[in-house]
Amino acid sequence: MSPKPVNNRRDILLLMLYSPGRADTVNEPITGRTRFMKMLFLFREELMKRFLADAALTADDFYQFFPWNFGPFSRDVYDDLTFFELRGFIERSDAEEEALPEAAAEWERWLSMSRQEPGDSSMSEYDEQMFRLTDKGVKFVEDLYASLTVNQRRLLKEFKSRLVDVPLRALLRYVYENYESQTTRSQIREKVLGSHGTR
């Protein structure tokens, strides 16, 4: 049986969780929905072409981001996290770090756009979450990860190491400074960029 090729956006989401990061251990968690969103956006913009040079997956098949109240946003990221959580591949737990107002507001916006029932208490309050693969998820992804080239694994590890521990505000600032077209609708532009945020 030949290894499964990386051929859809969900593969990248799972590989991002599986890949070692700064601590050099498989399945290092990613803290925060907003961080995960911005990591996938930056993957698309900065890493995808090099990472998937010979793959069938193209930018058109990946998460489609649009300028939104808190920078680049794709509803599909949250939907895919929920999809894998409901199937027992991803688990989330409360993170130790405090949630930024920006992250809570982005979550509230997703809830209003999603198919969640109004008043669903399990989804109404925002707490910063830490995402990782379950044992079932690790088992599912390990063959896919093993099929990556040495260069792909290196690129993914460097990318995750760089972004997983950076303060969220610094990550947001990087996105806002480098991808201005994705911040045209932002409600927090001035807060993120300070006095440089107004032009």
Show which residues each predicted segment covers.
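Domain-edge interaction signal
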Residues: M1-R199
